Amino acid sequence: MAEAHQAVAFQFTVTPDGIDLRLSHEALKQICLSGLHSWKKKFIRFKNGVITGVYPASPSSWLIVVVGVMSTMYAKIDPSLGIIAKINRTLDTTGYMSSQTKNIVSGVLFGTGLWVALIITMRYSLKVLLSYHGWMFAEHGKMSRATRIWMCMVKIFSGRKPMLYSFQTSLPRLPVPAVKDTVNRYLESVRPLMKDEDFKRMTALAQDFAVNLGPRLQWYLKLKSWWATNYVSDWWEEYVYLRGRGPLMVNSNYYAMDLLYVIPTHLQAATAGNGIHAILLYRHKLDREEIKPILFLGSTVPLCSAQWERMFNTCRIPGEETDTIQHLRDSKHIVVFHKGRYFKVWLYHDGRLLKPREIEQHIQRILDDPSEPHAGEAKLAALTAGERVPWAKCRQAYFGRGKNKQSLDAVEKAAFFVTLDETEQGYREEDPDASMDSYAKSLLHGRCSDRWFDKSFTFIVFKNGKMGMNAEHSWADAPVVGHLWEYVMSTDCFQLGYAEDGHCKGDTNPNIPYPTRLQWDIPEECQDVIETSLNTANILASDVDFHSFPFHAFGKGLIKKCRTSPDAFVQLALQLAHYKDMGKFCLTYEASMTRLFREGRTETVRSCSSESCNFVLAMVDPTQTVKQKLRLFKIASEKHQHLYRLAMTGSGIDRHLFCLYVVSKYLAVDSPFLKEVLSEPWRLSTSQTPQQQVELFDLERNPEYVSSGGGFGPVADDGYGVSYILVGENLINFHISSKFSSPETDSHRFGKHLKQAMNDIMALFGFSSNSRKEFH
């Protein structure tokens, strides 16, 4: 192959006349440019490390402090209270340094020490200030004088122009709640779900735990919280994600959809060109820490940015007992899957990032490639979709050497994985339900052998130009991937754009080398394992009952006019819909974040409360008046917001109990209370997809550029998984999953109940269908 020859910098042959050395100037040029690129990235990382390391001060502030100290010394004023004189006396006892030199060195050393002390003081002061969360519990729209003063203090100590990781060392640690508080909150959460006898028994177990075993486990947990950066995150990653032996597909991975209505181009290669380039632009900003940290409360309170570190060049590696996460500092290629074949695509040429048209050129070459897959290659990715133990054993036995190892390394060490899907997906106005359901299922599992589910994310481009993403869950949570995806969709449409003929803008480049086809030698024994994994994955995928739909009746704009939280409104609608669907209440999981703390991830909001149950029962009781229902709605809504705030500020229930359970396992002691708590199924698992970069989309001028959000598979075999995104002011997109094998669930039936519940609750506020249209 021509590209293989181009990759060789020099060749030599031994002849009777000596050694004949032949140099490839093009290859040497590429090696030189690659080296310069690597050193440039190292320098930028070093520079960013220095800037982040001294934040909230700046490197230039060192010069200001030192000059200030030297100026006072010149004016015969001692700002050090004698410290400079002591430094002066200890500097040089041999007499080689002049007195003037010693004065200068002493002043610089003292100034540097003072500068470091100021940095530490500012950083610690900011950490103390950020430990205050009273602002979150204040009445909406009202801010006390104390909170305003606190905000001013935070802004003073926060420095200027923070980079992505600037606040990391200033974020407080996640606090460990008191055992009795957590136990009491737990009992309160399960009271509406248990009969009196069951609740009495659980209360006895809980009280015994809180008095006897709980304090012992708590002591070890507090010890860990003083030592570790976050007492939850490492155990959560290991025991909830990496030690899971079931398939990642459906059970753990989640997806993100493209824009709902718009397809900028129907050319698959062009969509891939712009999409890949946009992702790489985001990586470029991430490498330089140019992505702004997310700030709450009027750009005042920072969220933890640690999860961004492993977004690219990351892969989950299977193990027999536990998986590991492999993360590289850099990767200069991607791997593209098409029709059962794998291609390695270099991302740089002549020392620069490939342009969108050049990436499109690469992708078109792959689409036009007529070669057939090698034996076992077409279904190879099914290994990442099935059980983890067979994949781990197979990887060790058949992918540890030779061409298989080289090709697998190319996949696992790629910046990310790309799938050129052979199907057409997306919203179709003539059949919205079927088209959206098909789109969701394709992104969630595809054909089970055409996504590499171990990669941090797989970028999927469909035949008709629609795109999407499937993400692995262990390295980060959905809002982090959502941040990337918002940037990609915006950059694709508004920054990069397309030519009139649908191609990427710019010209093709005949000098860029062709993609490299990965080579495999897969024996029959390995092919048998692949088939077994594929069968497992197919059974799992075919059992997923998915329903994704846009809710057009109203959005968060009208909900806010009702003076209530949009999230609380939707959560109460979900409770009402579930009760109408099942005729009973269930343990409900709503994902909240704990990124107000360093290395925080998620916490559970137990959305099914006594207050929400009272409201739901009133809604199905024809004897209740609208006034009574509204009163119960407001009580339930306020309770939900309170529970959400507790979860965000480190006073949740489930992560604390989970960590206590882990400690009990390390100590080899059994806790009937913890065992029962952690075995309770979440039959309704919910999550809101946040919009984090609303400035990227001007929905007033471009109302058709609305996001579809994303979703995940059902958590319980007899339950529902519901994801939703509040887009703009007038649209809510829902993604509902369940299993066909459960006789109790039906995603489309639940969707109908949910639409009705949303409308029924809105009707309490006196908004008719006509008034809703006027609001639109």
From Swiss-Prot:
Protein EC: 2.3.1.21, 2.3.1.-
Substrates-to-products reaction catalysed: (R)-carnitine + hexadecanoyl-CoA = O-hexadecanoyl-(R)-carnitine + CoA; succinyl-CoA + L-lysyl-[protein] = N(6)-succinyl-L-lysyl-[protein] + CoA + H(+)
Enzyme class, spelled out: transferase
InterPro entries, alphabetized: Carn_acyl_trans, CAT-like_dom_sf, Cho/carn_acyl_trans, Cho/carn_acyl_trans_2, CPT_N
Main location: mitochondrion
Cytoplasmic side: 2-47, 123-776
Active site location: 473 (proton acceptor)
Residue positions, PTM Phosphoserine: 741, 747
UniProt keyword annotations, A-Z: Acetylation, Acyltransferase, Fatty acid metabolism, Lipid metabolism, Membrane, Mitochondrion, Mitochondrion outer membrane, Nitration, Phosphoprotein, Transferase, Transmembrane, Transmembrane helix, Transport
Modified positions (3'-nitrotyrosine) in chain numbering: 282, 589
Pathway membership, UniProt: Lipid metabolism; fatty acid beta-oxidation
Annotated (R)-carnitine binding sites: 589, 602
Sites bearing Phosphothreonine, chain numbering: 588, 604
Domain-related comment: A conformation change in the N-terminal region spanning the first 42 residues plays an important role in the regulation of enzyme activity by malonyl-CoA.
Role played: Catalyzes the transfer of the acyl group of long-chain fatty acid-CoA conjugates onto carnitine, an essential step for the mitochondrial uptake of long-chain fatty acids and their subsequent beta-oxidation in the mitochondrion. Also possesses a lysine succinyltransferase activity that can regulate enzymatic activity of substrate proteins such as ENO1 and metabolism independent of its classical carnitine O-palmitoyltransferase activity. Plays an important role in hepatic triglyceride metabolism.
Subunit-structure text: Homohexamer and homotrimer. Identified in a complex that contains at least CPT1A, ACSL1 and VDAC1. Also identified in complexes with ACSL1 and VDAC2 and VDAC3. Interacts with ZDHHC4.
Protein name: Carnitine O-palmitoyltransferase 1, liver isoform
Organism name: Equus caballus
Origin organism lineage: Eukaryota, Metazoa, Chordata, Craniata, Vertebrata
